[in-house]
Amino acid sequence: MKAVVDAAGRIVVPKPLREALGLQPGSTVEISRYGAGLHLIPTGRTARLEEENGVLVATGETTIDDEVVFGLIDSGRK
């Protein structure tokens, strides 16, 4: 997908990517240089490991449903 950098240096993240990553107005992201490109990672998501019945299980407050998972899979295929 292509995006344009405006005069103020802003980039609009295309809607399919925002939806796939769960980005909403006010979401924060970590942005860094990655080779000849940029690496953009949503922040503020928490996950931790807790023991349940002797097994470590990832828990957190971020909800992920099938739509988010399929969106991530589809965005990785394009």
UniProtKB/Swiss-Prot annotation:
Domain SpoVT-AbrB residue range list: 1-45
Pfam family, one: MazE_antitoxin
Source domain of life: Bacteria
Matches recorded under InterPro entries: SpoVT-AbrB_dom (IPR007159), SpoVT-AbrB_sf (IPR037914)
Entry keyword set: DNA-binding, Toxin-antitoxin system
Translocase in keyword set: no
Presence of the UniProt keyword Ribonucleoprotein in the record: no
Gene Ontology molecular function: DNA binding
Known partners and oligomeric status: Interacts with cognate toxin VapC27 and non-cognate toxins MazF6 and VapC40. Interaction with MazF6 and MazF9 partially neutralizes the toxins.
Function: Antitoxin component of a type II toxin-antitoxin (TA) system. Cognate toxin is VapC27. Upon expression in E.coli partially counteracts the ribonuclease activity of non-cognate toxins MazF6 and MazF9.
Family indicated by similarity: Belongs to the VapB family.
Record protein name field: Antitoxin VapB27
Organism: Mycobacterium tuberculosis (strain ATCC 25618 / H37Rv)
Gene: vapB27
